[in-house]
Amino acid sequence: MSKAIKLPQKLMLLGSGELGKEFVIAAQRLGNYVIAVDRYANAPAMQVSDCCEVISMLSADDLEAVVTKYEPDFIIPEIEAIRTEKLQEFEDRGITVIPTAAATNYTMNRDRIRELAHEELGIRTAKYGYAVTLEELIAVSDNIGFPNVVKPVMSSSGKGQSVVATKEEVEKAWDYAIANSRGDSQKVIVEEFINFEIEITLLTIKQWNAPTIFCSPIGHRQERGDYQESWQPAGISEDKILEAQAIAKTVTDALGGAGIFGVEFFITKDEVIFSELSPRPHDTGMVTLISQNLNEFELHLRAILGLPIPKIEQLGFCASAVILASEKLDAPLFTGVAEALAEPDVDIRLFGKPTAHPYRRMGVALAKAENVETAREKATDAASKIHISSQ
């Protein structure tokens, strides 16, 4: 893309969760036309889009039908479970796939992105191996050593991930990973357990006609492989920030295209270790809804459309904490919102998901304070005040 783009553009979002919802809101503010696609009706992004479609995104025929129907200018994947081979066909026909069809194919699978980073680009990662059967997993785990981390090569929001402390826990980890694998993959990755000081996400914005730029690193904490809270700034040294930026630029340059990438790292006392990469807004980056002048969704949109990003300003010590469901519910109701919002510099986002189940992310609390510790306390306190029920 070398010319100034004309608005509105027609954007097709593949996957319509809470990240997609905030992206659609950003797109609508600049008058764009958005088609939200997902496997179930009334997904969060569908609630704010111009129109929506319910399909299996693993079906090449279903994807062909919706793309033919709407003829979008851009196809923007928001999830992993997509028939990525079809995206290459769309790109060959002149539709812009974000970041590119090839990059999407790489990053939909942990094995491909890990091999790109470690084997092709020579970047330090945790030691790793793969397994497609329980017997292989036992052998690979013995080779990697204990404790280790087992994950599906394709999953959503960290689901299916577990820390395996002993050989006796391997079978349970296998069952959990396969049960939470997305798409048609039955393959798991086993990683060396890194004794890190902090995990960070470096939001990396790759532009069509301007240099790659970065947000301030975001610290985050996970449970069950899924993010629970995040904060910005992360509080790591300038030399480690520069090292993480150099690694992120190397990987995203290899992938190409444009848009925001959530690049995850383990930060140890002495090292910056590449972990994972998502070619889209990152769940931990929801803190930017309160912490930056331009949030990650606005940055993604500007990068996609080739619009300028003159400055990313970090607005102080901020944090986010997830609001999780504890039981299975249809048409969930929320109480405690008024109590949560009574605290200054606190905001709440409820995602509008039509159903709930244990540990499903239903919303997020956002907070700002005079330091990171207080911001984290305010966010988790606000999240704890929100209760989800059927009546």
Swiss-Prot record:
Domain ATP-grasp, first and last residues per copy: 115-305
Reactions performed catalytically: N(1)-(5-phospho-beta-D-ribosyl)glycinamide + formate + ATP = N(2)-formyl-N(1)-(5-phospho-beta-D-ribosyl)glycinamide + ADP + phosphate + H(+)
Binding-site list for N(1)-(5-phospho-beta-D-ribosyl)glycinamide: E18, L19, E78, D283, K353, R360, R361
Gene assigned in the entry: purT
Family per record: Belongs to the PurK/PurT family.
Keyword Metal-binding in annotation: yes
GO-annotated biological processes: 'de novo' IMP biosynthetic process
Pfam families recorded: ATP-grasp, PurT_C, RS_preATP-grasp-like
Chain residues that bind ATP: R110, K151, S156, S157, G158, K159, G160, Q161, E191, E192, F193, I194, E199
Species this protein is from: Nostoc sp. (strain PCC 7120 / SAG 25.82 / UTEX 2576)
Gene Ontology CC terms: cytosol
Annotated GO MF terms: ATP binding; magnesium ion binding; phosphoribosylglycinamide formyltransferase 2 activity; phosphoribosylglycinamide formyltransferase activity
Protein EC: 6.3.1.21
Name of this protein: Formate-dependent phosphoribosylglycinamide formyltransferase
Listed PROSITE patterns: ATP_GRASP
Binding-site residues for Mg(2+), renumbered to this chain: E264, E276
